[in-house]
């Protein structure tokens, strides 16, 4: 009992010493970017500007010259194999059987290894990188199971390193091509490639590109002048193809007429022009327009108006003179005796008169630029009916019928294609229909074959005209 009591400590004898806690390990502060570590991003290198030459900036550090990209050609690895010996009668069938069995065993072992690897790598991404072996190369080693050579396995290509436009030249350089040298074994000469240029917008396949380029103004542009001179010469300089700008038509049915641009059609490269004579809006290709100054526009439009006024006044005077002549002739006929009617009629028949050439089914050109404000100027049309020797009715290609057209408003039209039918309108063969054989633009003459007379005649352009009538018509 005494021993047990001695081993038990009393509760009241507790120690009054203070209790303290401490840590023996401290956590180090982690830095996100370590400047001493080589794996971190390198600081940006500063460059300084050295000189400025034109639009080029030269720095202190010279730039490396761009290297020419070369894609080496993959050589074919065809190797010569010794010819197989023909099987002789001494061939051991047992050796052949052993070879077949050993090959089957190797295939089974390879298949088992493959399945084992697939099971082990079940959790791995199934997308594998399959190396491409050079075409025509056989794996090195004794058997077919040996690994391919390292040089036959291509490296992973960096497609961003080679631009698309430089890929073809890089392949040619790898094949041994050099700039300035010909390609070929027998006729190695440099052949310039044919580059097809795009046609100007708005010109189709039937348009003549050379004529459009010839009409386009190619003069040198003027240097800008001071503000005072620009304001002074503002009317002397063309504004260009802009709405409100003055232009002149260079080609087409409205050739030589002036007008102002009302609007532009950039999709079809055409402009809506209001003609100065007649105030009619027409659509013309921009290639057939030339901008003019306001001073030139005012001068030419004034001349056209004066010509129009003089033409109308001449027409009025001509009508008055014709009326006076008719009145005088009627008065003379009343006062002359009846016995003079016979000789007078004979003298009228013997008097020379101008020969008229109007005939039905002739294709003519309208040349009067004052008729209805020049609306039908340089337009091709067909004579529908002849009202009098010098008056006719015509129909345009659009189907419009024009009545009361005089002979002096029209001119004969010679076809361009050889073999087209023409009619002789002046001379002893008037009214004959033949075929055009050839034309001579320098002399304005043409060779015409007349089938009925079976002869070939040379006539002037004014003596023939394109005929659009029935093929079996050949009036005498």
Curated annotation (Swiss-Prot):
Biased composition (Basic and acidic residues): 43-58, 224-237, 337-351
Keyword match NADP: no
Residues covered by region (Disordered): 1-96, 203-244, 327-353
Summary of subunit composition and partner proteins: Component of the minor spliceosome, which splices U12-type introns. Interacts with PRKX. Interacts with DHX16. Interacts with PRKACB.
Every KOW domain range: 240-267, 415-442
Residues with the N-acetylalanine modification: 2
Organism in which the protein naturally occurs: Homo sapiens (Human)
Sequence similarity: Belongs to the MOS2 family.
PTM (free text): Phosphorylation regulates its ability to bind RNA.
Protein name: G-patch domain and KOW motifs-containing protein
């Amino acid at each position: 009992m005494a021993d047990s009591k001695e081993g038990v400590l009393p509760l009241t004898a507790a120690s009054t010493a203070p209790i303290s806690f401490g840590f023996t390990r401290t956590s180090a502060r982690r830095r996100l970017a370590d400047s001493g570590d080589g794996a971190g991003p390198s600081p940006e290198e500063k460059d300084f500007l050295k000189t400025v030459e034109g639009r080029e900036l030269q720095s202190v550090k010279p730039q490396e010259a761009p290297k020419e990209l070369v894609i080496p050609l993959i050589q074919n690895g065809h190797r010569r194999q010794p010819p197989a010996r023909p099987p002789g009668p001494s061939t051991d069938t047992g050796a052949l059987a052993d070879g077949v069995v050993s090959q089957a065993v190797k295939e089974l072992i390879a298949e088992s290894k493959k399945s084992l690897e697939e099971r082990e790598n079940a959790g791995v991404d199934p997308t594998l990188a399959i190396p491409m072996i050079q075409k025509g190369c056989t794996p090195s080693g004794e058997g077919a199971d040996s690994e391919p050579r390292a040089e036959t396995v291509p490296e992973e290509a960096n497609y961003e390193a080679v631009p698309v436009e430089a890929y073809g030249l890089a392949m040619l350089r790898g094949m041994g091509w050099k700039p300035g040298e010909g390609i070929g074994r027998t006729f190695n000469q440099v052949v310039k490639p044919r580059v097809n240029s795009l046609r100007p917008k708005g010109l189709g396949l039937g348009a003549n590109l050379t004529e459009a380029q010839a009409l386009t103004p190619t003069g040198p542009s003027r240097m800008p002048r001071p503000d005072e001179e620009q304001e002074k010469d503002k009317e002397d300089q063309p504004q260009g193809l802009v709405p409100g700008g003055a232009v002149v038509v260079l080609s087409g049915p409205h050739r030589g007429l002036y007008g102002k641009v009302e609007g532009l059609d950039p999709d079809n490269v055409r402009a809506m022009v209001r003609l100065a004579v007649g105030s009619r809006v027409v659509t013309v290709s921009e290639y057939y327009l030339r901008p003019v100054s306001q001073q030139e526009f005012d001068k030419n439009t004034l001349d056209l108006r004066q010509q129009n006024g003089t033409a109308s006044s001449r027409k009025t005077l001509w009508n008055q003179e014709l009326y006076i002549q008719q009145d005088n002739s009627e008065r003379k006929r009343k006062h002359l005796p009846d016995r003079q009617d016979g000789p007078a009629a004979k003298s009228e028949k013997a008097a020379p008169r101008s020969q008229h050439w109007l005939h039905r089914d002739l294709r003519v050109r309208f040349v009067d630029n004052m008729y209805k404000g020049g609306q039908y100027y340089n337009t091709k049309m067909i004579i529908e009916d002849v009202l009098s020797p010098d008056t006719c009715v015509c129909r345009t290609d659009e189907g419009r019928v024009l009545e009361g057209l005089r002979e002096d408003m029209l001119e004969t039209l010679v076809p361009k294609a050889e073999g087209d039918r023409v009619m002789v309108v002046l001379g002893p063969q008037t009214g004959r229909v033949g075929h055009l054989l050839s034309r001579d633009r320098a002399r304005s003459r043409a060779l015409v074959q007349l089938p009925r007379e079976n002869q070939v005649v040379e006539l002037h352009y004014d003596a023939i005209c394109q005929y659009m009538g029935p093929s079996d018509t050949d009036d005498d």
